[in-house]
């Protein structure tokens, strides 16, 4: 993150915009106090550059990018109201940030019913912060590990302040599935079998990557519907 901020700092000094409009720092594996100390410093740097910082407290279960949290104690999978109050006290007033609190959410794919989300954790945490610091203290929350979640859970989190949901696993599958179908249905054209030459039209990457892109776009459209943001922009409804 530091090199990216430095690149943005140089761009801003030249009268340009920052390299990115937002960054994420995941210090959830650290003790909360250490996490917040690092987050405060990064948020201050981001604020100077008009960059939003996304931070995380509480551990999202499962595995992501080779990082496995299966050995983490169960209580670490749930952000407490006290945690949320501490995050507010640590970061309020420094700059614009989003907060990924954890409520049983996990990375990677699980069978339906295997993941037990507790969206009420977000409700309770927001209430604790609001009771102490007022309605303006409510967080803009991020839902990590949203792939495969029940629509009812997704919609419930929206009422508790979720403004962003991550669905990396779902979009990966949406992209890959039609490509697999293409290969299976055109196996003799994709491969050069028994001295045959195959079919360039079927092994041309453009022929199947386009299908992946189209299916991913459909999954993204569904996500917009799930999050009640379809046909909406930051300027209003279209």
Protein language model annotation of sequence segments:
Residues 90, 178, 182, 226:
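Residues that form generic nucleotide/phosphate-binding pockets
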